[in-house]
A protein has these predicted regions:
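C-terminal beta-strand-rich structural cap/linker in extracellular carbohydrate-active enzymes
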Residues: 368-371, 383, 402-417, 423
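Solenoidal tandem-repeat scaffolds enriched in leucines and small polar residues
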Residues: 79, 83-86, 90-143, 148-156
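Long, well-ordered core segments of solenoidal/helical folds
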Residues: 10-27, 66-83, 121-141, 188-204, ...
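Aromatic (Trp/Tyr) and acidic
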Residues: 1-5, 9, 38-58, 97-118, ...
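C-terminal beta-rich recognition modules with glycine/proline-rich loops and embedded aromatic residues
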Residues: 123, 188, 253-261, 266-359, ...
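Solvent-exposed beta-strand/loop surfaces of large extracellular or lumenal domains
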Residues: 378-403, 422-427
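Short linear capping/connector segments at secondary-structure termini
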Residues: 30-36, 88-91, 147, 211-217
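Asp-box/WD-like beta-propeller blade repeats and closely related beta-sheet repeat scaffolds
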Residues: 33-42, 49, 64-98
Length: 560
């Protein structure tokens, strides 16, 4: 996404050095022979394969593909058909084979690139192993059966490790691409439905201490180690898979929610560090502070992966044309059905504002469908083509499919419904949050300081002023006093005597973004809320730091 000679040289060197570690039998990994298949060995091999295949896709360097073949062949010899080893019984005991079985994804990808049947056979063998009882899972993992049977995610497989479980289903998506086995796609869809219903929180992620936890219902509670960044990134990757396979615009809605909230909220302002966990209340804490013994954690690696898939889903090709999934200032180029380049130049301040203007550039006029995503929350959407109102269907949660002969320099205007909504907590406990467009709002101690009480009479308990449809008249603040905050809002509230007050809130990504002790934030607030308890005591860095008695210092990678 940012090609340069320096980046090319860095990647080339990394791949050369990685391949140089390959042993004579094909193994690339960090475990001695006596420890193969244990703990995170196959998980590490999975990422070696993904890296080699990604490099091959980018460069067509056959040495990388051959190295990937040798890694896979060595694994097949150790844990494939006829090896006597059930791959679902390998790996760290706590996660019952989920990590090892997620190697399904690169094995299916390797088959796609080589057409060599042994890789397809191994992929199918991995899926069959899920049904076999083993020493780690006496009833077997049963991932497909439990997904289709709508088992609650936090009960699935006896080890509801969120990141690794979704990774297995990513592999199932790739296997579906080469087999067209409908059961595979149905299983993934059922899992997605269950995660949306039971686990994914308002910011577009889930998990507590890395496992599914019925988080959709529990999200307004003070949760220990909430929303692992690996879960955020993998949820986004799974949604990207399902967007490609189904064309369901709600997948793009979820990608957008995760991008603008959970993912960017986990990234430090300079981008050099990521959080391991990011709650909906408390403080921002870098991964190195949360796990000082790890430093370069899985979350520091995965955060950028979630970020870097964004150009891939922002504008996509379809069977009949192209789809615009993400609005904002951008230039994109995709192919039309006839193969000519379709350039879309978009001007917009979205998601700060809801107006989008796009220009279509084509070498020659062509008839095709341009799909415009209508977010599920945008109940009032207006579209114009060359200044004329579009008279087709504009339905929230779908695409507006504009089929016409497109000409060079055609203009598209979209006006999205940016009215803020009050969302009641799914638990029914009386908490509420505010969402404007895709942006989740939060209280921040820089805007509403922690306090012991309110001195102004008559009351100190406030609640959001919503209308009968749960909309609230939130106003964007121009030129806010805290420039480090991306979006600042004036939010109308009323006290228990009925008097109106204006409180300041900000976007979730900016909330707590000094990443320092004492900068506290909160998304869900009890209705009505007491200022003395707006920021829950002891829900700060302590809920996200696993060792030590004080908040650790973060290393500055910019220091020489």
């Amino acid at each position: 996404y940012a090609p340069s000679a320096e980046h090319r040289a860095t990647v080339d060197r990394a791949v050369r050095e990685l391949m140089a570690t390959q042993s004579a039998d094909g193994y690339i990994g960090t475990y001695p022979d006596s420890c193969h298949l244990g703990d995170w060995d196959i998980w590490g091999r999975k990422y070696v394969l993904l890296g080699l295949l990604a490099y091959y896709d980018q460069t067509k360097e056959t040495a990388a593909l051959e190295a990937a073949r040798r890694v896979a062949d060595h694994l097949i010899a150790e844990a494939g058909p006829g090896s006597g080893t059930n791959i679902a019984a390998t790996g760290w005991i706590g996660w019952k084979g989920l990590a090892s079985c997620s190697v399904l994804e690169p094995i299916a990808l390797l088959y796609q690139r080589t057409g060599e049947k042994r890789y397809l056979d191994f992929a199918r063998h991995i899926v069959r192993s899920w049904d076999e009882p083993n020493r780690l899972a006496p009833a077997g993992l049963r991932l497909i059966q439990e997904a289709i049977g709508e088992t609650a995610p936090w009960k699935m497989s006896g080890a509801p490790k969120a990141y690794e479980m979704m990774s297995c289903f990513e592999g199932l998506c790739e296997l579906y691409r080469v087999t067209a086995e409908p059961l595979y796609l149905e299983a993934v869809q059922r899992l997605v439905d269950a995660l949306v219903r039971d686990e994914i929180m308002i910011a577009g992620s889930g998990s507590v201490a890395e496992i599914w936890c019925h988080g959709a219902v529990r999200q307004s509670e003070p949760l220990y180690q909430g929303m692992e960044t690996c879960v955020t990134a993998t949820w986004m990757k799974l949604m990207y898979q399902m967007l490609r396979l189904t064309g369901d615009s709600r997948c793009a809605d979820r990608l957008e929610t995760s991008l603008y909230n959970a993912l960017l909220g986990a990234m430090s302002p300079r981008g050099e560090w990521w959080a391991y966990y990011s709650g909906l209340m408390g403080e921002r804490v870098h991964s190195h502070q949360q796990f000082p013994d790890v430093v370069m954690s899985c979350c520091v690696a995965n955060g950028p992966r979630g970020l870097m898939i964004t150009p891939s889903w922002a504008v996509m090709t379809t069977a009949d044309g192209a789809a615009i999934n993400l609005y904002g200032k951008m230039n994109s180029t995709v192919k039309t059905p006839s193969g000519q380049p379709l350039k879309i130049n978009m001007e917009s301040e979205y998601p700060v504002q809801g107006n989008v203007a796009a220009t279509v550039n084509l070498p020659q006029s062509e008839a095709f469908a341009l799909e415009l995503r209508i977010p599920q929350w945008s109940k009032r959407t207006a579209i114009k083509i060359n200044g004329e109102p579009y008279d087709g269907y504009i339905l929230p949660g779908t695409y507006a499919s504009i089929e016409r002969t497109w000409n060079d320099n055609d203009k598209i205007e979209v006006e999205l419904d940016m009215r803020a909504r009050v969302v009641d907590a799914p638990s029914g406990v009386g908490d509420a949050a505010i969402v404007r467009g895709p942006i989740v709002l939060a209280f921040d101690s820089r805007l509403i300081p922690r306090r012991d009480g309110v001195t102004e009479p008559p009351m100190y308990r406030y609640e959001f002023m919503r209308d009968t449809d749960n909309y609230i008249d939130v106003q964007l603040v121009e030129n806010p006093e805290t420039p480090a905050i991306w979006m600042t809002f004036d939010v109308p509230c009323k006290d228990e005597a009925g008097n109106k007050h204006i409180l300041r809130m900000c976007d979730y990504t900016s909330a707590g973004n000094t990443w320092q002790e004492g900068n506290i934030f909160r998304v869900w607030a009890q209705q009505p809320f007491d200022f003395r308890h707006l920021y829950t005591n002891n829900v700060d860095w302590r809920v996200n730091v696993t060792v030590g008695v004080g908040r650790p210092e973060i290393p500055d990678i910019y220091k020489k």
